[in-house]
Structures are given as C-alpha cells and as structure tokens.
Design a protein with these regions (language model features):
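General helical secondary-structure elements
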Residues: 1, 63, 88-89
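Generic alpha-helical secondary structure signal
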Residues: 6, 10, 43-46, 50, ...
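Amphipathic alpha-helical interaction modules
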Residues: 23-67
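Amphipathic alpha-helical binding modules
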Residues: 71-104
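Short terminal alpha-helical segments
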Residues: 1-38
C-alpha cells in the first residue's frame, strides 16, 4: 500500500506545531481535566467531565479558527480539501479536539 502525503501536509504540520507551542496550556489542561475525571468518585464525575468538555471546546475553537483563517485565503474547492486534511491531522495528533472540529 502506498501512502501519499496530502497537498497541505507541510503547512498543516507547521500550523499544528505553532498551536502546540502557543496553546500548550490548553492541551495540558485538557489532559489534566480528563485525568481528574477518570480518578473522580461518582458524585464528582459529572462536574469534572463538564470542566473537561469546556477545555476541549476551547481547543477545538482555537484550531477551527486557525483552519478557517487559512482556508479563507484559498480558492474555492481547494479550501475544502485543506479543511479535510487539517481535520484529519488534528484527529491524528489530538483526538479529543477532533471530535467536534468538523462542526465548527
């Protein structure tokens, strides 16, 4: 099986690297809140899961903003290809942030 790199692989890789540098706090907080939820007793779990979801939504929105800003500079048709590649790259790197990115 031959794997082909996407047309936008390099630029998306750089964008995600910058996101990781600029928003490492969001990535770390999501991991910490998920761990807290997983350790929680039943009576605390619902609130802690809500906290986790809030951080994931923040990260997802930040990533969608990056995606949409760049896609806006591309010709019609090409922008959709870029968006699909971007969403797949996010899913490979941070599954939690990818769950809702297509809906943003």
């Amino acid at each position: 099986m031959i794997f082909r790199r996407g047309r936008f692989s390099d630029v998306i890789g750089r964008q995600l690297d910058l996101f990781e540098l600029d928003h490492s706090d969001v990535i770390e907080e999501a991991a910490e809140r998920l761990a807290a939820y997983n350790r929680a007793e039943r009576d605390e779990a619902e609130e802690l899961y809500g906290d986790y979801v809030d951080v994931v939504e923040t990260g997802t929105e930040l990533l969608a903003d990056i995606r949409d800003a760049f896609a806006g500079t591309l010709p019609e048709g090409t922008d959709e290809l870029y968006e699909r590649e971007f969403n797949r790259a996010v899913a490979r790197r941070w599954k939690a942030f990818a769950l809702e990115i297509e809906n943003r």
